[in-house]
Structure formats: C-alpha cells, structure tokens
Amino acid sequence: MDTKLDPWSSSDITDYSKLFEEFGISPFENVLPEIPSPHMYMRRKVIFGHRDYEQIAEAMRTGAPFSVMDGFMPSGKVHLGHKMVMDQIVWHQEMGASAFVGIADREAFSVRGFSWQKCREIGVEEYILSLIALGFKPDGLIYFQSGCGSVKDLAFELGAKVNFSELSAIYGFSGETSLSHMLSVATQAADILQPQLEEFGGPKPVVVPVGPDQDPHLRLTRGLAGKMNMFRVEEREDVKTGRKYLSVRGKTAQKEALQELKKRIPGKVKLYEEHIDVLEYPDLAGLEKLVREVTVEFGGYAFIPPASTYHRFMSGLQGGKMSSSIPESQIALTDSPKEGAKKVKRAKTGGCVTLEEQKKLGGKPEECSVFELMLFHLIASDEELLEIKQECISGTRMCGSCKQLAAEKMQEFLKDHQEKRELAREHLDEYRIIYKD
C-alpha cells in the first residue's frame, strides 16, 4: 500500500481514488440517488466515499432507528475542518438519527499529554459551544470519554478481543507506544459501538462521518464488532452439491440461544453443537435481524458493523495542508470576524499572475483555497457556486472580487456563529452532557 492513514498526524492525500482500491472504501456517488434530500457536501462531492451507507439511507427512507456518532479530540481551537464534521452530525440528526458526540479527552491525555482540566475547558469552550451553535439538538448525547461509564466498560471488553500485533498492523504502533495510547484506541471503538448498547435501544445502523485519516478506527471497530457478537451469519456452499445455504455460528453462544433460534427460523434447519445450518431461508438480512433479536434476549452483543462517510480535507489558506499548528493556514470558529476576513483576503488563489492573463486564460478554481471556502462553507446555492466557477474559468471573474465576496461572507458567518455560541453557553444545562467526575 502506498497511502498511509494516520489519525494522529496531518495526512496529505493527493489522490482520493486510491482509497477505493487500497482500503475498500466505496464511491459515494453510487449511493447518492438513494438519499432523501442529500446534504450539500454529498451533492458537491466533498463527501467522496463510504462504507455501508446503504443501510443509513434505507433507515432515512423507512423511518427505522439509526444513529450518527462522532468525536473530537480537545487539543486546540475548533476550526472549519471540525465544522465539516459538525455539519454532518447536525444534518443526520435532522434526518432522524439519534446523535452521539464524544469529547476524546482520554485520547488528548494519552497522545497530547493534556490535563483533564484542560481537556474539559477546551472541550466545552471550543467544541461543544460550536456544535450547539451549528444546530445540535438537546436530545443528542454529548459526553467526555473519561466520564462515560458505558464507554469505559465496553472499551475494557473490547480490549480482550484485540492484541498488540493487530494494533501495530493497523496503526503502526511500536514498542515505544504507551499503554494509555493503546487504551485510547479501544475507547474510540467503544465510542462508535456505544449507540448499539441495550440502554440506547440496542442494535441499529450507526454512521460515523470522518476524514480518511480516521479510517483506521473504523477498520478496527468493524472487526471488533464481529468478534464481540454472540453469533455470526455466514453464506456457505455444500461442497458435494454446490447448493448454497446460510449458517449461524457461535462458539461461545449459550445452547439455549441456539435452541431458541432453531424454533424461530422457518423452513428446514439443522442444529449442531455450535451452529445452525439454515437450508430454506434465502433472506440473509431477515435472518441477521432475527439472530440479533435472539442474541439481545439472551444478553449477548449483536453489533452491526458501523457505516462511515469520508470527506475531502480542506487545503490550507496558503496552499498545502491545513494545520492547527499554523494559524494562518486555517480559520478558527473563534477568530474575530475581522481576522477571519483578513485571512481570506490573504489566501492563495488559483488565478493567473497578471490581470491580462486571467482574462485570457481564466482561473483554476480547483486549485483555489478561496473557491474551496465557498464550496465547503460559504455559498449555500449550488447554482450560485456553479456561476462563480464558470466565470472564473472563463476569465470574466477576477480573484479580487472573489476574495471580497468570500471575506464578506466569512465575516458574516463568524459574527453570526459567535453570537449563537454565546446563546449556546446560556442553554448548556438543557443538553445531556456527561462530564468527568
């Protein structure tokens, strides 16, 4: 594999299409027609890939229960890159999802060395206030990992299903990696699976919107979901007859659970010591649902592997990668409106060197950080955005006018957002927030 995905470094991906082949991510455009009222990021191909999003789209269409889950490490200022994730959480919540947001203070403690108090301050002042200001509803759950007992308990159980060799293969961990860092990874997997615990309604589809650098967490969690489950359903083929059938297998399953399954599965079935062969039940999804129901009744886990969406990274305002450690490369949601506008005006564009060349050759919006701000955040109308793009390419729109428009819109957004942050502060006690004791 040529592409390295690291959740704790600033990844630079130049060819997103490689991720389809190397990591098994599917193109998002294939599932787009199934989504009612798709989000702006979906329509504009900012979200480029997914895993198992079909089940989320189906839940939206049918009104079935589903969840959106995401988290933020409280390690610095909340910026436009974080806003992208928050926008997707809020949209899924509006589409009917129960929403879960974890403040990854265990990760910040182990990876960044931050104190618990600092994690709490950053978590509230930066991330939680902005999340609420962007439209997060009070019926969602916000929690600090260190204060959430269900996450900590589940993380401990998950830790029994993964070893150092697996973590090394997925994350590149070495003998220098601290134990708390490895524990924070198990905690992230627990974050993702928590919405399917019985206290939150049991098994259901869960989507995690991420940048591709976070995919290692999804791969680990999907594998752990299967290892934790009481049963697994497999499609098999009789080596003698070539006939296909389904098999429900569970080495650690209670015999009573297997017997109950045998009673409920219609058609011809064969019960063995540790599995059931289902010979006349072609509906795989229906069988999986039945297996989950019986599993929960007998106190076992029946996790559905989490779905995920993958969005493009924002480039830095001066070109290259956006980095929290380089203030001029990004706009924080707590920057003053005037400072935000100034950063836009100083940003790198995709225009030509001279005005004459620009009129003759046109600009390159795909290389312009100012157009990217409009694409990701500032222009709500697809028609208006397309008009700006066409005028840029044709040479009838100059970089100065684009910067002025984007700067004005950024200033308006930051002013409005920061007013909403102060309102959010006044209403914090109306939200379900679990803090560290």
Curated annotation (Swiss-Prot):
Any one GO MF annotation of this record: ATP binding
Residue ranges annotated as motif 'HIGH' region: 74-82
Keywords associated with the record: Aminoacyl-tRNA synthetase, ATP-binding, Cytoplasm, Ligase, Nucleotide-binding, Protein biosynthesis
Chain location of the short sequence motif 'KMSKS' region per the record: 321-325
GO biological process, one term: tryptophanyl-tRNA aminoacylation
Coiled coil: none
Enzyme Commission number, as recorded: 6.1.1.2
PANTHER family, sorted: TRYPTOPHAN--TRNA LIGASE, TRYPTOPHANYL-TRNA SYNTHETASE
This protein's name: Tryptophan--tRNA ligase
Natural source organism: Methanosarcina acetivorans (strain ATCC 35395 / DSM 2834 / JCM 12185 / C2A)
